[in-house]
Amino acid sequence: MAKEDNIEMQGTILETLPNTMFRVELENGHVVIAHISGKMRKNYIRILTGDKVTVQLTPYDLSKGRIVFRSR
């Protein structure tokens, strides 16, 4: 799958789940389950409830995503 196929959306962390998974509410109101991308995990980027994040979604499964950026 090419990087161009991903859909990027802004969202807010609703709750923290086990295994670095998060429940994220997107701008359009949908709630998805997202995990942290590898580079964020490698650099120990901490994500807390209420943080604004950028989530990448795949067109194949819009209920799961990957957190790629945490806004300040």
Curated annotation (Swiss-Prot):
Q: Which GO terms describe its molecular function?
A: ribosome binding; rRNA binding; translation initiation factor activity
Q: Which HAMAP family match?
A: IF_1
Q: What is this protein called?
A: Translation initiation factor IF-1
Q: Fill in the subunit field for this protein.
A: Component of the 30S ribosomal translation pre-initiation complex which assembles on the 30S ribosome in the order IF-2 and IF-3, IF-1 and N-formylmethionyl-tRNA(fMet); mRNA recruitment can occur at any time during PIC assembly.
> Which SUPFAM superfamilies does the record match to this protein?
Nucleic acid-binding proteins
Q: Which NCBIfam families match?
A: infA
Q: Name one GO cellular component term.
A: cytosol
